[in-house]
Amino acid sequence: VLSPIPSSRRTQRGRQTYSRYQTLELEKEFLFNPYLTRKRRIEVSHALGLTERQVKIWFQNRRMKWKKENNKDKFPSSKCEQEELEKEKLER
């Protein structure tokens, strides 16, 4: 993979772990609104002691998780599930 930044300058970031309190507050905020304005993102990041970037990425990841969970019913995740759905349709 080619990168515009030389490998000697790239830094590998570790995985961010959030405290229970931070996760709870982020989840509450997400339930209220899955999309944050920049102003609200700044407020949340200051209140939780996180960077704006961390909050932004947490929300992006959470929206993808929500999307996957809600599409589970609509799209079978395996061939076996697909066959079961087709079988049910034929029985109707």
Curated annotation (Swiss-Prot):
Keyword Nucleus among record annotations:
yes
Keyword annotations from UniProtKB, A to Z:
Developmental protein, DNA-binding, Homeobox, Nucleus, Transcription, Transcription regulation
Gene Ontology MF annotations: DNA-binding transcription repressor activity, RNA polymerase II-specific; sequence-specific DNA binding; sequence-specific double-stranded DNA binding
Where does the UniProt annotation locate this protein?
Nucleus
Q: Which GO terms describe its biological process?
A: adult locomotory behavior; anterior/posterior pattern specification; dorsal spinal cord development; embryonic skeletal system morphogenesis; grooming behavior; negative regulation of myeloid cell differentiation; negative regulation of transcription by RNA polymerase II; sensory perception of pain
Expression by tissue: Predominantly spinal cord and kidney.
Output the Gene Ontology cellular-component terms. nucleus
Say if the entry is tagged with keyword Transcription.
yes
Region Disordered: start and end of each range? 68-92
* Annotated TM spans: none
Quaternary organization: Forms a DNA-binding heterodimer with transcription factor PBX1.
Role summary:
Sequence-specific transcription factor which is part of a developmental regulatory system that provides cells with specific positional identities on the anterior-posterior axis.
Q: Which family does it belong to?
A: Belongs to the Antp homeobox family.
PANTHER family hit by this protein: HOMEOBOX DOMAIN-CONTAINING PROTEIN, HOMEOBOX PROTEIN HOX-B8
Query: What is this protein's record name?
Result: Homeobox protein Hox-B8
Starting at the broadest rank, the lineage of the source organism is: Eukaryota, Metazoa, Chordata, Craniata, Vertebrata
Gene name of this polypeptide: Hoxb8
